[in-house]
């Protein structure tokens, strides 16, 4: 695969930022959503190196969704994500990307007894107690029973209490 720049023309005020999408299986609607918010999106293959990514001069990195066990990508994804932390730029992810971010921080993932699949999944924001109705399709979750002091849980599933979001407070 090669690096692609996604330029879908939507009429919305955008944040002037170049976000690199690491493609672990990203869906087109995710790219549309990102491009509606940021001025430039570059999609790179999941096997891209740290040097490949920084050569694009990112303002942020998005770790995409994708299939399967997050620990199976440890040989190529985790080392790159750990190096990206040194850039001190926003790194965010959904689904598999969220799980890879957690693994890169030393957290663990586990296979869920019953995965989350489909629409209408209520997720609680622990910062303000608001609830969003989401669509999900994953069978793994992040274990949060032993979070380091620099990581906090931000979102949980109201179906089973499993983790749906984390935030790194300090990388130093």
Task: Name each region found by the language model.
Residues 1-56, 68:
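RNA-binding accessory domains that recognize and position tRNA/RNA substrates
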Residues 3, 14-15, 57, 87, ...:
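Residue-level preference for short coil/turn positions at secondary-structure junctions
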Residues 18-23, 134-135, 172:
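Active-site-proximal beta-strand elements of phosphoester/diester hydrolases
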Residues 60, 65-144:
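Cysteine-nucleophile active-site neighborhood
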Residues 26-27, 49, 97, 138, ...:
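A generic "binding-loop/recognition-motif" signal
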Residues 44-46, 112, 137, 156:
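Conserved beta-strand termini and adjacent loop/short-helix elements that scaffold enzyme active sites
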Residues 129-171:
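Catalytic beta-strand/loop cores that center a nucleophilic Ser/Cys/Thr
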């Amino acid at each position: 695969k090669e690096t692609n720049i996604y330029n879908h023309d939507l009429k919305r005020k955008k944040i002037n930022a170049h976000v690199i999408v690491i493609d672990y299986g990203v869906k087109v609607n995710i790219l549309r959503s990102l491009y509606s918010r940021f001025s430039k999106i570059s999609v790179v293959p999941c096997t891209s190196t740290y040097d490949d990514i920084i050569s694009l001069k990112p303002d942020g990195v998005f770790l995409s969704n994708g299939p399967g066990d997050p620990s199976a990508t440890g040989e190529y994804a985790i080392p790159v994500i750990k190096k990206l932390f040194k850039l001190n730029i926003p790194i965010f992810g959904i689904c598999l990307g969220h799980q890879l971010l957690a693994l890169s921080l030393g957290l663990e993932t586990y296979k869920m007894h019953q995965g989350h699949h489909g629409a209408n999944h209520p997720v609680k924001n622990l910062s303000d107690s608001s609830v969003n109705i989401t669509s999900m399709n994953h069978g793994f979750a992040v274990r949060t029973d032993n979070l380091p002091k620099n990581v906090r849980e931000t979102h949980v599933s109201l179906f089973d209490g499993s983790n749906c979001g984390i935030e790194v407070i300090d990388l130093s």
